[in-house]
UniProtKB/Swiss-Prot annotation:
It is found in: Cytoplasm. Belongs to the MnmA/TRMU family. The record marks H116, Q329 as: Interaction with tRNA. GO terms for biological process: tRNA wobble position uridine thiolation. Residues 137-139, 296-297 are annotated as: Interaction with tRNA. ATP binds at G11, M12, S13, G14, G15, I16, D17, S18, M37, G115. It comes from Bacteroides fragilis (strain ATCC 25285 / DSM 2151 / CCUG 4856 / JCM 11019 / LMG 10263 / NCTC 9343 / Onslow / VPI 2553 / EN-2). This is tRNA-specific 2-thiouridylase MnmA 3. InterPro entries: MnmA-like (IPR004506), MnmA-like_C (IPR046885), MnmA-like_central (IPR046884), MnmA-like_central_sf (IPR023382), Rossmann-like_a/b/a_fold (IPR014729). The keyword Membrane does not apply. The gene is mnmA3. It holds the Pfam family tRNA_Me_trans_M.
Amino acid sequence: MKESKKRVLVGMSGGIDSTATCLMLQEQGYEIVGVTMRVWGDEPQDARELAARMGIEHYVADERVPFKDTIVKNFIDEYRQGRTPNPCVMCNPLFKFRMLIEWADKLGCDWIATGHYSRLEERNGHIYIVAGDDDKKDQSYFLWRLGQDVLRRCIFPLGNYTKQTVRDYLREKGYEAKSKEGESMEVCFIKGDYRDFLREQCPELDAEVGPGWFVSSEGVKLGQHKGFPYYTIGQRKGLEIALGKPAYVLKINPQKNTVMLGDAGQLRAEYMVAEQDNIVDEDELFACPDLAVRIRYRSRPIPCRVKRLEDGRLLVRFLAEASAIAPGQSAVFYEGRRVLGGAFIASQRGIGLVIEQNKDWK
């Protein structure tokens, strides 16, 4: 198999971003090989046709079974545990980038490339993910679990561009129809409401969980709900309960099948606990004077401090208002636009004791 430092494997979905990625890298002199991972839905005909038009090698990897057994299963399991998952965060290290590395090795490619709107920066011997220039499309939040060995082989050509610039670029290159395509789905295997997807994939879920009670913070029953997996922390719309004032989901108790409701003020938090972290340089993270954390995609970074607990988890202290801490979501730590690491937001049960045990932390 031919090997070259200019041979790069591109993950091709057939969409706007991966098409632009291929064209840009071709212009830079790379030899492009495309691979399309079929994980859900129809045959990737668009990707085949685009690869043929660009004159590049193209392969299709049918990964529907392992994808369903890992990423989709995790997505469902998280909701069944009362957590709010982000499947892209799980998919990137466990599936997408792992598969790209395996195929790159098999096809003699030194590099892998994707259409993520993020950048990479080398500093002090480490590779850091950096937020892309387009704040509306930045995808650095989803990449925090990637290891250094993977990042050292990545190229993200779109990191310095806005989505509109990418559309304009495709139009200039003669890909007019492609430039006008709509946005891809936020979760690639779900069309519409995730609740319908849960019911479709788990027909037994409603019978298994059943209706439960909305309760107040004092434990007073407020009315019935459809089952705890169908609610997320911070949710206001779609509760189908009239309390005479706005109500938000504060807590979810899978064991009791209860969903606690309250007002917006009760969602605020000064601390949170996170787990299963991936930090680039711990000394840098813990000492960073300008550290901020993003607790959901597209949310504003919140100034914070972080310390390691004796049990290995992270305690995060917010230095500005934080609200709707949802277990299962990612907490991604930034210095400016540079990602220093991330972790999964843990269950906040027992956090009062953790705070008390660390009351001298400044």
